[in-house]
Every structure is written in structure tokens, then in C-alpha cells.
């Protein structure tokens, strides 16, 4: 199968990021993740898994029927395509393999993860958990420009290998907000809680769609380059219904029905960090062998029988008037004379950072309280 066809297959299949949104929601709390990173983490591991362990991983990712070589080649092509967006934004994605000193790993595994997943291998002394955690955290912090720190904690001294995946995104708004228009405003967290936020304002031409069936407003706020923020803003009191029903079909339908219109957009500044332990979620999705004594990870090592103990995911996003980096250019936008739509994000909403060319979801999150 050609790489471009395979990539299309991988991107159009249901993904854990949308198919199992209910699994990762945390009521009354912020939720944030990088679906492409935790998906890549198991593609990374699946690179050399065998038998039912591999089958379960691929089934959870929507890759049933694909061979490991096809998935590897598809992901390699995806990384290449994402690389074309890097001039106008800073997008760094990669992986690492922390290996116990003296532990023998199958050479082909290291070659494959380096070639297909841009992965770096390094040795650590897991028999000294605190020192090992510090070294791994330094690796992650360096790769994410110090945005993700202290991710690894409470290491088991019996650990023989840790697979690491990271993504760092720093984008400039295509049309920045004017900081002089930012003002204090109320944000309704829930029926009992209202907080004051720094509310940004901009009037401009945006792609927008108001879904009467799902009682949701969807709009795209573009970054420079090939990346946009998709804002999903349910009507008051409809967030729970949306979270319980949202799927990849909804995202595609909304995207297809977007149209360009004048919009008065009010959006709070926010910064969000979330850490998730994904073992329970993955087990609910059918990935069980990898965590048990029946795990077949013989493609990683022939030395001893090993299993996956935990999968930890951490993601960070900051949003302000300039995006996440100051923009020096001044732009003038020609507006039609018709009255603009008004979108005021003054209650919880969902955000997705989407790479426009591949339709990859780089990050996704639920903003419940912008002040936290």
C-alpha cells in the first residue's frame, strides 16, 4: 500500500482521541491531552510486539488489518508531512527509549524506533529510581523547551525500559488579538461558581458553524502555518450531552459545514496542564495482554519476559493574545458591512489543535476554569 494511501487510512479510521472521549473526561476538572502522542506511544511499543498483544494494541487504535510495517511507514510519512508546518510555528515531536544499564534490547527494535519514530535511546540506572527519574525528566524538559517538567515520578527499581513520547507546539495566531481590548469578564464554571478571567476580544472573519441538532457552535481560529484551533462551544447546560455523544463523525460533519463569516470573538486567556495515567483507559479499550503476564514483547528483548506497567501522558497548552509567541506584524482585515455573529466563551468549552493538511489532532482539551 503506498504511503499516502496508508496515511489516509490511518487518519480516517476512528481514533481513541474521539472514539473514547468519555473515557478521558474528568467532571468539574480540566482535561487536556495530545491524542497523537499517546496513540504514537502504543504505535511505538507495537513496533515490535507480537501475537495477541499486538492485535489488541492495533484494534484499540483502529488499525485492525494493517501490518506493523504499514503502520510504521505511515507514521514516518506523517512526521514528514507535519515537518512542513514548522517554519511558521514551532512543532517538535519525537520519542525516547530509556533502557536499564546492562539490559539487552533487540537491535532491530532500536533501529525501527529511530528510523520510523525519530526516537533516541539512552541508558539509565533504574536500580536508583530517583536518579533515573531525574535523568528522564531532564530529557523530556529539554525536548519540550521546559514546558513539561517532573513528569516521571515513583519509578519501580525493577523497570527495564521506558518509552517516552513528546510533542511541543508553539504557534502564533494568524490574526493576533489586540491586548488593549483584553478586559475582565465573568466565566461561569458551573451553576455554583463564577470566576473573573482576562477576556480577549477580536472581530474578524472566521470559519464557523452553528449545529442546531447538537446545540453547539464550532469555529476555527487559525495559527500561522497549517494549524488551527477548533473551538467546540455547546449551549449552556449541554456540555455533558456533547461529551457523551461526540465522535469522529461529528468532527468531520462540523468541519465540512464550516463557512466564513464575520465574528465578534471573546475568548479567555488560559493555560492548562494535565497528567493522565492511561493504563485503565487502555484496558477499557481492550488492551489487556500488554499489562499482564501473557504480554508478548519478545520483539523488544529476548533476555527476560517483560510487560508494560504503566502509561503516563502529560500535555501543556497556553493561550494568549499573540498565540504563544509575540507577533511583530500588523494586519488589516477588510470586513463586510453586515452585523457579525457574537461568540462569547464565558462557560466551559472544548478545544482541539488540528494540523490542517493531515487533519491530525495534535492536542485536545476541555477548558472548565481558565483561572486554574
From Swiss-Prot:
Signal peptide (UniProt feature, chain positions): 1-19
Site feature: Reactive bond: 337-338
Glycosylation sites: 214, 226
Subcellular location: Secreted
Gene3D superfamilies to which the protein is assigned, alphabetical: Alpha-1-antitrypsin, domain 1 (2.30.39.10), Antithrombin, subunit I, domain 2 (3.30.497.10), Serpins superfamily (2.10.310.10)
Region called RCL, residue ranges: 328-347
Comment block on domains: The reactive center loop (RCL) extends out from the body of the protein and directs binding to the target protease. The protease cleaves the serpin at the reactive site within the RCL, establishing a covalent linkage between the serpin reactive site and the active site of the protease. The resulting inactive serpin-protease complex is highly stable.
Protein name in the entry: Alpha-1-antitrypsin homolog
Protein species of origin: Cyprinus carpio
Amino acid at each position: 500500500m503506498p504511503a499516502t494511501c496508508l496515511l489516509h487510512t490511518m487518519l480516517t479510521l476512528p481514533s481513541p482521541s474521539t472514539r473514547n472521549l468519555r473515557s478521558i473526561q474528568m467532571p468539574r476538572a480540566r482535561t487536556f491531552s495530545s491524542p497523537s502522542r499517546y496513540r504514537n506511544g502504543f504505535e511505538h511499543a507495537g513496533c515490535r510486539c507480537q501475537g495477541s498483544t499486538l492485535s489488541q494494541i492495533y484494534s484499540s487504535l483502529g488499525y485492525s488489518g494493517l501490518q506493523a510495517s504499514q503502520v510504521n511507514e505511515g507514521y514516518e510519512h506523517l512526521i514528514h508531512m507535519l515537518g512542513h508546518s514548522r517554519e511558521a510555528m514551532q512543532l517538535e515531536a519525537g520519542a525516547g527509549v530509556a533502557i536499564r544499564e546492562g539490559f539487552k534490547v533487540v537491535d532491530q527494535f532500536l533501529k525501527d524506533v529511530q528510523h520510523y519514530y525519530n526516537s533516541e535511546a539512552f541508558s539509565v540506572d533504574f536500580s536508583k529510581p530517583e536518579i533515573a527519574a531525574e535523568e528522564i525528566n531532564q530529557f523530556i524538559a529539554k525536548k519540550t523547551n521546559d514546558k513539561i517538567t517532573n513528569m516521571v515520578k515513583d519509578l519501580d527499581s525493577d523497570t527495564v525500559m521506558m518509552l517516552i513520547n513528546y510533542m511541543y507546539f508553539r504557534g502564533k495566531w494568524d490574526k493576533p488579538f489586540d491586548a488593549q481590548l483584553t478586559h475582565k469578564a465573568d466565566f461561569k464554571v458551573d451553576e455554583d461558581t463564577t470566576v473573573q478571567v482576562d477576556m480577549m476580544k477580536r472581530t474578524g472573519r472566521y470559519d464557523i458553524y452553528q449545529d442546531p441538532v447538537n446545540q453547539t457552535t464550532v469555529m476555527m481560529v487559525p495559527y500561522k502555518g497549517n494549524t488551527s484551533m477548533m473551538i467546540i462551544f455547546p449551549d449552556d447546560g449541554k456540555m455533558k450531552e456533547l461529551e457523551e455523544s461526540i465522535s469522529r463523525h461529528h468532527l468531520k460533519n462540523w468541519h465540512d459545514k464550516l463557512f466564513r463569516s464575520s465574528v465578534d470573538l471573546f475568548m479567555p486567556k488560559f493555560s492548562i496542564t494535565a497528567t493522565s495515567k492511561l493504563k485503565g483507559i487502555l484496558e477499557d479499550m481492550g488492551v489487556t495482554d500488554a499489562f499482564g503476564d501473557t504480554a508478548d514483547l519478545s520483539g523488544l528483548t529476548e533476555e527476560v519476559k517483560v510487560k508494560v506497567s504503566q502509561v503516563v501522558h502529560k500535555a501543556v497548552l497556553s493561550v494568549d493574545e499573540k498565540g504563544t509567541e509575540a507577533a511583530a506584524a500588523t494586519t488589516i482585515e477588510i470586513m463586510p458591512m453586515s452585523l457579525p455573529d457574537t461568540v462569547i466563551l464565558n462557560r466551559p468549552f472544548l478545544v482541539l489543535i488540528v494540523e490542517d493538511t493531515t487533519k491530525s489532532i495534535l492536542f485536545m482539551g476541555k477548558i472548565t476554569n481558565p483561572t486554574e
